[in-house]
Amino acid sequence: LIDTSQALATALGMHADIVHCHAPLPRTLLNNTELLATYQQYLSDDAQQHHKAFDDLIGRHDIAPDAAHLLEGAPENMLPRFVRKHEIDLLVMGAIARGRLDTILIGHTAERLLESVDCDLLVVKLPAEK
């Protein structure tokens, strides 16, 4: 997806920013007091794991730090704000094929974003994980 985005940006004379959103488990979903006690540690660990994985990914693709953005929050909330703030013209997203039940329960992020981003949206189907 990064390679596709970078190639597209080059071909169109654009700049490619790489954005990843991560949303930790909301505290309101926790009803176990033992889990609540460790929630702050969970948040810290989750953020650390995402930062490490994102930094590794950015490093493998030689992306400048000012073009790499790790956002905490749900993509459908964070990406429209990012698009407006940075005046993005084209948002390129990856999508995976899910089963019908997953689609009903989780939905498609791209579908939720389609009407809320102020730019064109290109969805690239990613290869199925094996």
What are these regions (language model features)?
Residues 86:
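Active-site charged/polar residues at nucleotide-handling catalytic sites that mediate phosphoryl
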Residues 28-32, 80-81, 103-105:
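Short, well-ordered secondary-structure micro-motifs
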Residues 90-116, 130:
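Glycine-rich, Arg-bearing micro-motifs that act as flexible, cationic patches
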Residues 6, 55, 111:
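Active-site phosphate/pyrophosphate- and oxyanion-stabilizing loops and adjacent acidic/basic residues
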Residues 2, 44-55:
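Short, surface-exposed alpha-helical segments at coil->helix boundaries
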Residues 1-40, 44, 60-63, 67, ...:
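Small/aliphatic-rich secondary-structure junction motif
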Residues 70-73:
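Short loop/edge segments at beta-strand edges and connector loops
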Residues 53, 75-80, 109:
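Short acidic active-site motifs
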